[in-house]
Regions:
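Active-site nucleophile-His-acid catalytic modules used for acyl/amide transfer and hydrolysis
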Residues: 57-83, 87-91
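Long, amphipathic alpha-helical surface segments
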Residues: 1-17, 23, 32-37, 42-55, ...
Length: 139
């Protein structure tokens, strides 16, 4: 099987982002057709795998903040979700919110979350996540 994998990888190439193949169809990875026009896409299992992998990465990023371990599960979920949605570089721009979280001032952290471009862009998601940060409860 490893020889087969090696051969297919060599023939197809490996591309870590979506691209158009030689016939103009959206493809990713090792020749994986994702173009909807031809029935391409991902299975539910593949979607779940990708999500779990992304959450694992965001969890590891969240654990780099000294204050993260002291948060309860709903507040940790808010931070992980923000990292998932924004990416770490953009989440690191939430300095006032992060400082408030570190100080245990969750009301201010929630206010700072809502006072952002992100909140204007995502609407109800921001309201829900700010409420979770404020209360420490699942919503």
């Amino acid at each position: 099987m490893s020889k087969l994998i090696e051969m297919i990888r060599q023939h197809e190439g490996v591309v870590k982002h979506a691209y158009e193949d030689s016939r103009g169809y959206l493809t990713i990875g090792v020749g994986r057709l994702i173009d909807k026009k031809l029935g391409g896409g991902l299975s539910d299992d593949e979607i779940d795998y990708l999500l779990a992998n992304d959450i694992k990465r965001c969890q590891a990023e969240a654990e780099t903040y000294e204050w993260f371990a002291g948060l309860n599960e709903p507040r940790q979920a808010v931070v992980i979700s923000l990292l998932f949605n924004l990416g770490k570089p953009r989440y690191d721009g939430f300095k006032a919110s992060q400082a408030a979280i570190a100080a245990g001032d969750y009301a201010t952290a929630a206010e700072e979350m809502l006072d952002s471009k992100w909140a204007a862009q995502v609407g109800k998601r921001a309201d829900e996540m700010a409420a979770m940060m404020f209360s420490g409860e699942w919503h």
